[in-house]
Amino acid sequence: MPGDEETLDLPAWNRVPDLTWGPHHRSAMASLDSEVREECLREDLKFYFMSPCEKYRARRQIPWKLGLQILKIVMVTTQLVRFGLSNQLVVAFKEDNTVAFKHLFLKGFSGVDEDDYSCSIYTQENTYESIFFAIKQYRHLKNISLATLGYGESEDNRTGLKVCKQHYKTGAMFSSNETLNIDSDIETDCIHLDLQVLTTEPEDWAQTSFFRLDFYRLVQVDISFALKGIDLQAVHSREIPDCYLFQNTITFDNTAHSGKIKIYLNSEANIEECKNMNISGSTQRSTHYLLVFDVFVIMICLASLILCTRSIVLALRLRKRFLNFFLEKYKQRVCGADQWEFVNGWYVLVTISDLMTIIGSILKMEIKAKKLTNYDVCSILLGTSTLFVWVGVIRYLGYFQTYNVLILTMQASLPKVLRFCACAGMIYLGYTFCGWIVLGPYHEKFENLNIVAECLFSLVNGDDMFATFAQIQQKSILVWLFSRLYLYSFISLFIYMVLSLFIALITDSYHTIKKYQQHGFPETDLQKFLKESGSKDGYQKQPSALLSCLCCLRRRRSNDHLILID
């Protein structure tokens, strides 16, 4: 093909001047050259679509990527398990401390949160008692706490408590004629109580005017303080323990002015580098081993990334050769399905997995070195990459007809399933918005859109049906009747019709694949080209030795363009 192939590097005895060749000879050699290029392209295509075992038998090419993927699965999974155990300790330590803080600083906390808040109070006396209780508990923290806690510095580099109250700017209430004048602008007043102030006797700080609350104007009271802690359970795992700074905020929420003040405790834990720590044993050596292991994982993923990227590039080159040849010979373009055969989705998946593993491993090393503290991003990267690695193994099982039914069924049913889900999703969203608007005030499972979507999805799978029916409040007969019509229609529509059709689409694709496996798949243009004979009847009289020589010479010159993909 012009511009795409190099000229033949023939031996000196074969380089005859064009003037000695007649028109018949030049036409024959041109046809022979086209025949050689077609045979070379067909061989490269056949080799590209071979399995690693077939490639090894054909050209003795060792399947490096297959061996590397198997090794990578073992290494990445081991890395993920170790990181998951470490992350589990971190999350458990944070949650345990949050529960401990609620018991320490919230008066009357029962151990179980009320909805999304911890506890609630209903009288002015209980409000003052709860505020002063939290302050006094902070003062006597080291004498009452079981944990290794200490006082930390807040964001303004001060040790102690910061109490802020938000209230409407001005207001006046006259109970005689039931009038209330309120300026909707909210102002915030704050006071800082140092440890020296809290330890004074008598407690003069409690008698200040700041703690005289006008409850009809009060919007919110916040008590903020910082505490330090050490996670010593990491020592049992032969790791360097983490030091934490807990930024705690106790919020008394009176926004609704309904006679009920909700109390929240929010604790944000930040990991910091421990200072002046001396731990004997093999902890430091164990950390070094983990860092070396992470470096080895990065090297394996980098090698896999290079090999897969090279394979993708070579596949695109082969695709370009085939498209140009097909257009030149048959005067038509290759269909899109055949073009996508050259884009190996498994290589793309492995490439993405390698990139995520490399980035996640680097973050993990920084976390082990106490330079970073964000476990969540690292866990998402490592977890997703491990998922992709294990999914990529299916590619090698797909070479066996017994195991590739799942892959072929997913490929065949995915377009139809996506189109079906797009239509069913419109109905699902309609039910979601309707349930949120109508049933939200009367049912805890319909309070917001996220919970409604989760509740409806559970109903589609047949989970928790009776509880959803039973928990509706019968304060309004009209809403109660509507809830029955709403739930019965949704369950009937999605379980008996939508879900059944969804399964039928996948089942139909499965039966189609089984039928094709028994009677053969429909042949595409690419498959027909691979089955064609490379030589035509008009050129069978040409010496086969010359054809073989030309093919070998051409392959020797165009060796860089061969597709050697295992």
Curated annotation (Swiss-Prot):
Disruption phenotype: No visible phenotype. The secretion of specific cytokines (CCL3, CCL5 and CXCL2) by macrophages exposed to bacterial lipopolysaccharide (LPS) is decreased. Mutant mice display decreased migration of macrophages into the intraperitoneal space after injection with LPS, or after infection with E.coli O78:H11 (strain H10407). Expressed in activated macrophages and microglia (at protein level). GO terms for biological process: adaptive immune response; innate immune response; macrophage migration; neutrophil migration; positive regulation of chemokine (C-C motif) ligand 5 production; positive regulation of chemokine (C-X-C motif) ligand 2 production; positive regulation of chemokine production; positive regulation of macrophage inflammatory protein 1 alpha production. It is found in: Cell membrane; Lysosome membrane; Recycling endosome membrane. It is a multi-pass membrane protein. Its main location: membrane. Gene3D superfamilies: 1.10.287.70. Keywords: Adaptive immunity, Calcium, Calcium channel, Calcium transport, Cell membrane, Disulfide bond, Endosome, Immunity, Innate immunity, Ion channel, Ion transport, Lysosome, Membrane, Protein transport, Transmembrane, Transmembrane helix, Transport. Residues 449-469 dip into the membrane without crossing it. The most N-terminal extracellular/lumenal domain (referred to as I-II linker or polycystin-mucolipin domain) contributes to a structure with a four-fold rotational symmetry in a tetrameric assembly; the structure contains a central highly electronegative pore with a 14 A diameter. The pore is critical for Ca(2+) and pH regulation. The protruding structure formed by the I-II linkers may contain all the interaction sites with lipids and proteins in the endolysosomal lumen. Nonselective cation channel probably playing a role in the regulation of membrane trafficking events. Acts as a Ca(2+)-permeable cation channel with inwardly rectifying activity. May activate ARF6 and be involved in the trafficking of GPI-anchored cargo proteins to the cell surface via the ARF6-regulated recycling pathway. May play a role in immune processes. In adaptive immunity, TRPML2 and TRPML1 may play redundant roles in the function of the specialized lysosomes of B cells. In the innate immune response, may play a role in the regulation of chemokine secretion and macrophage migration. This is Mucolipin-2.
